[in-house]
Amino acid sequence: IKAWKSGHTDNDLSVYDLKTKTFWSENIFVERIPSIRASILGWKRNLDEIQKMDIDLIVPGHGSAVKKDVALKPILKYFTRLISQVRKFHQDNVSPQESINSILQREILDSKKVNPEGWALFTEYHYSNITKVYTELEWE
């Protein structure tokens, strides 16, 4: 059992079975967008650490059990993309609302660029994720 530093929430836990190389974690979302409630930077660090572990199967907090790469690659790609976009918005002095509007405009033009993972609940959580990340990265 491992307690993680701030990531998805402020109290994430996981269980790892050495014998079967199975990892249970609420930090991992499969087939649906992650909802950021604590720290995207902390969560990404946690996922990077999980990526280095000798895991065969991940039982996510949200979604079906899958192989490690199937679980981690989409969420890490999304986090990297979101962090990069929001940092650019900060550099260009774009407000949180203007950031969301910019992404909304792109979504209308080409939804595959905005939600390439094809996640469920994307519209419900993506824009709150932008706002959360915007606030977190404001103090970098």
Say what each PLM segment does.
Residues 4-85:
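Metallo-beta-lactamase
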